[in-house]
Amino acid sequence: IEEDGNAHLITEGLRGDGAILVNTEGKRFYDEVSTRDKVSAAIIAQPEKSAWLIVDQSMVDKSAVIAGYIKSGYTVTGATYEELAKAMGVDEATFTSTMNTWNQAVEAKSDAEFGRTSFANPLTAAPYYAIKITPAVHHTMGGIVINPKAEVLNEKGEAISGLYAAGEVTGGVHGANRLGGNAVADFVVFGRISGQSAADNAK
């Protein structure tokens, strides 16, 4: 999040790669590898409706994506947990305790606090980095109902002759939670189907 309010999409894949989330109090607050809708709701429930995404140098070394975030100035950094906490503006003792507790959880393969079951790596390789994040709408799943021919259905579930739809204006395609990247297939597949259906109807 930039000072002017503009923001950039940060991949959620970093959480699966070993990153953790802490709130503005320096504490973890949720299972980071839960579904995006649940994690987003948990972030919104935090002070300032935001969180910090924490990674270490070992993650940076393996990820051109993170290196790009650093180059773009999206991160704050510190040579120690205390220095990173200071750069983030959170309590140093609390954040350090959070990091130590997480590293112990990784070693034990057991997260007693939030039940996370994915432990890619401890965050022990200095320097450390944090990215300020907040949930934002970048895709909608609610909308008008279509059938397999991409025909728009009325309230009775009947196809409306000559009316077709595809993409984000439609609902029910992804269920309760969209998986990253699936929207591209949705647009392409139903876009093509709607075009074919419209062409067939025009014959």
What do these predicted regions represent?
Residues I1-K203:
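Residues forming the flavin
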